[in-house]
Amino acid sequence: MATIKDVAKMAGVSTTTVSHVINKTRFVAAETEKLVLQAIQELNYSPSAVARSLKVNTTKSIGMIVTSSEAPYFAEIIHAVEEHCYRQGYSLFLCNTQNNVEKIKNHLEMLIKKRVDGILVMCAEYTQDSLDLLANFTSLPLVVMDWGPDNKHTDIIQDHSFEGGYLATKYLIDHGHKDIGIIAGELTKTTAKTRYEGFIKAMNEAGLKINPDWVMEGFFEPEDGYECMNKILAQDTLPTAVFCCNDVMALGAISAIGEKGLRVPEDISIIGYDNIHASRFYSPPLTTIHQSKSRLGARAVTLLFERINEKSEERAVIEMHPELVIRKSVKSRL
């Protein structure tokens, strides 16, 4: 691998001159610059990112720690983060944790060794062990996005999931549905719990009974939607509509309904949550609750850049208000 000394020798100049050409830190005669650039091209020389970072105290890179980059909702946020980084001339190191505290610790240590300029942590929930661990890593700018209760270590995402759960359920009620089931997430998790509470409020306001046989709990995966829907379909009486608390569980539910020879929305209406990109291509296209993944990703990165440039540590609140997206998976029963 070629070094700066090799470039200097081929061009017949000093290593200092080569450095000035690369970094544009001083005027260099056009003919000399041409010789240096030709040598760089012929030798396929690439400056050491680590060496440059030690000089200018920046690597133009950030780390991002997420629970899982496979989940469509997080994947769309990650895409927005990467695009925003690219436009700012930054590279992104992506680390998956599966909510494993040891992996979070190892990833944080690795990113610090790589001298990233800042770290973005975006998980759906945090254990106390994770929060205590993050509190110890204050040596560089850190933005911790948290959907959970107020915590002194974290920024806060107020996604108004209660409002979204209420909005989804009320839409079903307003279209004449009275027998409504729900496939919720894990109800020990803040996001799942608040969406479920929004469902309860809408049902209670309308004076509708909640059938416990139609209340299911999953883990926000398509398999959970499929299995939970099959349990509902095994009951003696069926709901006319089901609120799935994310779009991928809705996909599993639609698959289970089809396998039983029933149709969406003619026999059972389905409404989802998140408005992931694929939801418009479901069969039928999914009526769902929208949350802006691109705005969240851009806002999180902007906040991190502010901390990098201004050394600000003030906690931030990012608000996301849910919106109804009407497609073709809900039938009117009026």
From Swiss-Prot:
Biological processes annotated in GO: negative regulation of DNA-templated transcription; purine nucleotide biosynthetic process
Domain HTH lacI-type: start-end pairs: 2-56
Domain of life: Bacteria
Residues reported to bind hypoxanthine: 73, 189, 191, 220, 274
PROSITE patterns xref list: HTH_LACI_1 (PS00356), HTH_LACI_2 (PS50932)
InterPro entries xref list: HTH_LacI (IPR000843), LacI/GalR-like_sensor (IPR046335), Lambda_DNA-bd_dom_sf (IPR010982), Peripla_BP_I (IPR028082), Tscrpt_reg_HTH_PurR (IPR023588)
Quaternary structure, from the entry: Homodimer.
Protein name per Swiss-Prot or TrEMBL: HTH-type transcriptional repressor PurR
